[in-house]
Curated annotation (Swiss-Prot):
InterPro entries (alphabetical): Cytochrome-c3_hydrogenase_C, NADH_UbQ_OxRdtase-like_20kDa, NiFe-Hase_small_C_sf, NiFe_Hase_small_N_sf, NiFe_hydrogenase_ssu, TAT_signal, TAT_signal_bac_arc
Principal subcellular localization: membrane
Function: This enzyme recycles the H(2) produced by nitrogenase to increase the production of ATP and to protect nitrogenase against inhibition or damage by O(2) under carbon- or phosphate-limited conditions.
EC number(s) per entry: 1.12.99.6
Organism: Cupriavidus necator (strain ATCC 17699 / DSM 428 / KCTC 22496 / NCIMB 10442 / H16 / Stanier 337) (Ralstonia eutropha)
Bound cofactor: record note: Binds 2 [4Fe-4S] clusters. Binds 1 [3Fe-4S] cluster.
Protein name (record): Uptake hydrogenase small subunit
Subcellular location: Cell membrane
Lineage: Bacteria, Pseudomonadati, Pseudomonadota, Betaproteobacteria, Burkholderiales
Residue numbers binding [4Fe-4S] cluster 2: 230, 233, 258, 264
Keywords for the protein's UniProt record, in alphabetical order: 3Fe-4S, 4Fe-4S, Cell membrane, Iron, Iron-sulfur, Membrane, Metal-binding, Oxidoreductase, Plasmid, Signal
Amino acid sequence: MVETFYEVMRRQGISRRSFLKYCSLTATSLGLGPSFLPQIAHAMETKPRTPVLWLHGLECTCCSESFIRSAHPLAKDVVLSMISLDYDDTLMAAAGHQAEAILEEIMTKYKGNYILAVEGNPPLNQDGMSCIIGGRPFIEQLKYVAKDAKAIISWGSCASWGCVQAAKPNPTQATPVHKVITDKPIIKVPGCPPIAEVMTGVITYMLTFDRIPELDRQGRPKMFYSQRIHDKCYRRPHFDAGQFVEEWDDESARKGFCLYKMGCKGPTTYNACSTTRWNEGTSFPIQSGHGCIGCSEDGFWDKGSFYDRLTGISQFGVEANADKIGGTASVVVGAAVTAHAAASAIKRASKKNETSGSEH
């Protein structure tokens, strides 16, 4: 019988107090209030760890690299305690026939109750011969494992959209998972790679509430993909003020002005980069001085240079510059001063007339 998360933690010598603290941090990482703490604790105490099978198709393994760097919760807690990661040919010790035997065993034992996580995508051209796993095309393995899965998580832009291996003319016919598997609930977690805490947060939510998170129209978790990077960017005030970097390493760049004119795709990209950030919340690309390339959006790889300026953005500040806005402000201030002076003159004249009238 599979142990519960709490049983594993107790076996590791973790106290009840530390367990509740962990549940509190988990609620915070998911954007949930303190009222959810008892519900999370109960789920961790009573629900068995969920078996997860993690497959790899055409990809660069950047999603796995991101995942193992999660800090809230730690990847080791997710892998060793929260879930039962029974198959992942990148992280598991077993290999070859032994690894494939484990896959078959878990699929049989937990039929209909395991989560399938997919990193990368299947190529369909030439019967899928561009990606071979265990001696057979990855497309065959994907369909075989997916048929009895409880739900599917598409890790990264490769599995979610196709990504760079699907770039025109796409000779291998690399195809996102949802276009191959159409009869299962699929949670897309795009990004190249996704943020580590977003990945572990999705898993934590599914284990805690025993359901998939609320998704947007594109199948992404709303808790992490409901806002544009631009909406919470710390450079947003410069955007609204029309203060833009015009050349790399110019004075505006050194002052941390908006990178919109340098091709930043933040205004059209939905992700949690500007709030959750990367490397335990240390930074994100825009904070490091480079514009967002929109890596979590469908088709970003075929939309031209990363340094091409976005067009069609009609918000205040996009076409304005500091001089224009400064000039406008001067006109407004000048008009206000003139109006104030006129009002003061009228008031003085009125008082003078009142004084003259009283003398007579």
